[in-house]
A protein has these predicted regions:
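Active-site recognition of the HExxH zinc-binding catalytic motif
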Residues: 91, 266-280, 284-287, 291-292
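Contiguous, non-catalytic segments that form substrate-binding/exosite surfaces or channel walls
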Residues: 114, 124-253
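N-terminal membrane topogenic signal
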Residues: 34-47
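Short, positively charged and aromatic/hydrophobic N-terminal segments
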Residues: 3, 11, 18-23
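Pan-zinc metallopeptidase signature
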Residues: 335-394
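Hydrophobic alpha-helical membrane-insertion segments
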Residues: 46-62, 138-143
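Membrane-embedded alpha-helical segments of integral membrane proteins
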Residues: 52-115
Length: 394
């Protein structure tokens, strides 16, 4: 006990006689200037300013078709070609790990920012806040460059010389019937389970994905791009909860697919996402390209899936336009095709949730932000392209 008191006393007395008067220079508040803030994190400020400058230029010039076409040819398509080749060699989805890393980093930085604000460590809090802001601005700026530009450059329809014109119900019925026949025919040559549902090996479908655009590129040279492999997403079930069958990630130029969804539409969904790699941004055009690619691929699984995708869009349109005609065409479908349609509907019915509804609204807003005024209805616009193209082909 005496030792404890001795130590306490020595510490207390060691400070005695050294009490200092307040230094007026240290207590005087320092004036905050732009230079002092810049010195706290110069790299973050530089990244933020460059990102904001590009974003300002993008939103001012995005209606200038010549500028957007130049950026598309000089920067966007070359980047997608380079990144597509680079990351295609990786057997897993790099995109998925990038998203997980950025999500974790964002959570850590937000927690760190809150802690530093609570502790009034203003300089460190400012650095953390600027890190969050600069990284977010840079990611958005790159997104507008590597994806947004495509919405304002020449569309696939324009590059391919296709036209959209008014179609009659009779025209719609004719092409719907054509794809019903194609689906029924191709459906006889694919692997099925005892329940009659399409059961092809999904890993094998992904393995064959680099080759599916060969035929379509001969018809539409503007679709030429490196032959890259689509990637299954490890957390595919999470995509189902927000009703995503897949997505294209412009930073890595990877086509990422929901491998948990029904196999019957997986090949055509792969073709859809790979259309984005080829500079096809709009969803209706990507669906059209997916159908053409699958039908011209020479691969029975892809051909069946493409015909099924086309029938679904055309059939839904015909259902709204002429129910009796739709019912008559539907009656011509083989039982195998009907089994796949039922299995697909049953699967997605399990994910009719508020989260899925919010996801659809968010994505519709996203499409409209980038000039796709039809929003989610743009998927239905592929009906016009399919009807005109295949009607003329006959």
């Amino acid at each position: 006990a005496g030792k404890t008191r001795s130590v306490f006393f020595s510490r207390l007395s060691s400070g005695a006689g050294r009490c200092k008067m307040p230094d007026m220079e240290t207590t005087e508040k320092k004036k905050i200037t732009f230079r002092s803030l810049w010195r706290l994190c110069p790299a973050c400020h530089a990244v933020l300013l460059i990102s904001l400058a590009w974003l300002a230029a993008y939103f001012l010039l995005r209606e200038n078709r010549a500028v957007m076409n130049f950026l598309c040819k000089a920067l966007v398509r070359p980047w997608h070609a380079f990144a597509g080749r680079l990351f295609s060699a990786v057997p897993f989805s790099v995109t998925e790990w990038v998203i997980l890393f950025l999500t974790a980093l964002g959570v850590v930085l937000l927690v760190l920012l809150i802690v530093r604000l609570i502790r009034r460590r203003w300089a460190k809090a400012y650095r953390t806040g600027m890190t969050i802001l600069s990284v977010s601005a840079a990611m958005f700026a790159l997104f507008c460059l590597w994806w947004g530009v495509l919405y304002y450059s020449d569309s696939f329809t324009e590059q391919a010389g296709l036209e959209r014109r008014d179609i009659s119900v009779q025209d719609l019925e004719t092409v719907t019937r054509y794809f019903a026949e194609q689906a029924s025919s191709a459906g006889e040559h694919v692997e099925r389970g005892e329940d009659g549902v399409f059961r092809a090996d999904k890993s094998d479908i992904f393995r064959r994905s680099p080759d599916i655009y060969g035929g379509a590129e001969q018809i539409f040279p503007c679709l030429a791009a490196p032959a890259v492999r689509a990637k299954p997403v490890l957390l595919s079930r999470l995509l189902s909860y927000i009703r995503y069958t897949g997505f294209f990630f412009p930073y890595t130029a990877e086509a990422n697919l929901n491998a948990d969804s029904p196999a019957c539409l997986l090949p055509s969904t792969i073709a859809h996402e790979l259309a984005h790699l080829r500079g096809v941004a709009r969803e209706d055009e990507a669906n059209f390209c997916a159908v053409v690619a699958c039908m011209e691929s020479g691969d029975e699984d892809y051909r069946y899936s493409g015909a099924l995708l086309a029938y679904i869009y055309l059939g839904n349109a015909l259902y709204r336009a002429d129910y009796d005609a739709w019912r008559e065409v539907y009656s011509t479908l083989s039982e195998n095709v009907r089994a796949d349609l039922r299995a697909n509907n049953d699967y997605w019915a399990r994910f009719e949730t508020p989260a899925a509804d919010v996801s659809e609204k968010v994505y519709e807003s996203f499409l409209q932000t980038y000039g796709d005024d039809r929003g989610m209805q743009s998927y239905g616009a592929c009906v016009d392209l399919l009807t005109v193209y295949y009607l003329d082909a006959e």
